Amino acid sequence: MPAGGGAPEASPFNGRNNPKALEGFRRLHETRKTAILSLVTGGEGASPRRGLLFIGGAGPDRESLGERRGEVWLAVAADAGLALALQLGFEPDLVVGDMDSLSDRSLLDRFPPDRVLRFPQDKDETDTEIGLRVLRERGCGDVTIAGGGGGRVDHLLAIAALFEREDPPRRWVTDGADIRLIEEEFEVIGWEGSTVSFLPLGSQASGMRSEGLQWPLDGLCFRRGYAGISNRVMARRMRVWVGTGKLLMVRTLGEVSR
């Protein structure tokens, strides 16, 4: 307070009395937003950084996975997913989990300690959740999960539930299914003859359109508890649009639809 009891002197820390401070705070906020966007996407206008998470359970072959190491920004193996990763020719950047289901512990010997993140068996997250979180924390905005087929039904349902989260994976590939998240539009070439099914995420998915399917989705609304099962891709190019809500699309691998 200046002598004589006048108004407080303008200060860089007193934004109400210092327009320059307000402008500085605004610029700082925008800089932080840009930095966060750059971390997740790789830069303005760039595609999201791609992460690959290998987990325990039956996984796809290399052709069904379709991922190339040079296109993946970060690969993480969760527990027994390490064996699947190495089987498919991927050496993960990090191995995470409690390692209780990794049958061959000697596989860990090829990784330095700073690339193995160990967690206790008694924890609030599954190894899959930990792997997904690690990828997110390291800037991956487009995550594919490989593995998780067969085995316990509760584990399968828990992985499927990840697609309901705020930052879901984009894809999950097992030995028998290629599962994709469709938020607005999906397009693929080369699936002609494949069996595909569609399930809504959340309360409903509506305003749908499609091209290249035997039974078009045009005008349909899938509410929670309903699904479109055993559709078939009839053209080289298939496209699906969702107006409101989200869809899970399940492509059957290696078997004829029932």
Locate each region found by the language model:
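Long, charged alpha-helical interface segments
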Residues: 175, 182-258
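Short gly/pro/ser/thr-enriched loop/turn and capping motifs at secondary-structure boundaries
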Residues: 82-84, 101-104, 125, 152-153, ...
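Short Gly/Thr/Asp-enriched flexible loops that form oxyanion-binding sites at enzyme active sites
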Residues: 153-164
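SAM-dependent methyltransferases
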Residues: 27-28, 32-52, 236-258
